[in-house]
Design a protein with these regions (language model features):
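Short, solvent-exposed alpha-helical "recognition" segments
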Residues: 79-94
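Short alpha-helical "recognition helix" segments of helix-turn-helix
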Residues: 62-67, 74
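General nucleic-acid-binding
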Residues: 1-22
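Short, Lys/Arg-enriched anionic-surface-contact patches
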Residues: 26-46
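Short, amphipathic alpha-helical "recognition" segments used to contact nucleic acids or chromatin
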Residues: 44-58
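Intrinsically disordered, low-complexity basic tails/linkers immediately adjacent to helix-turn-helix/homeobox/MYB/SANT
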Residues: 91-111
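A general alpha-helix detector
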Residues: 11-15, 31, 49, 73
Length: 111
């Protein structure tokens, strides 16, 4: 799928090129700690987890409980998974290739 051309510009290219230069998990932490607030990082991480849970077949109720994401955010991410540019699916697929259990529904243990 095509990327929205309204996003393509020199500043976005520069950011993405910088991200592509990161060589380790530690470098990612260092860079993103500098470039994002903790809240922004939590929001980005939460969106990826919502996408993973949707792709795994989790239901909205479980996703809300685990991530704290609103149903509006979950719906938007689901729309992106189904009709977006394919970025979520591409990354989730690659992560699942490295970890066969990545897209399994992870049930919380009840006390």
């Amino acid at each position: 799928m095509a990327v929205d051309e309204r996003l393509r510009d020199k500043l976005h290219d520069q950011l993405f090129q910088a991200i592509l230069e990161l060589r380790s998990l530690d470098e990612c932490y260092e860079f993103f700690e500098d470039i994002c607030t903790i809240q922004e990082m939590r929001a980005i991480s939460s969106r990826l987890e919502v996408a993973r849970m949707l792709a795994a077949g989790d239901i909205y109720e479980d996703i809300v409980k685990k991530t704290g994401a609103s149903t509006a955010t979950i719906s938007r991410i689901k729309r992106c998974l189904n009709f977006g540019s394919g970025g979520y699916r591409k990354i989730l697929g690659r992560m699942a290739q490295k970890d066969p259990h990545f897209l399994e529904v992870k049930k919380e243990k009840r006390k």
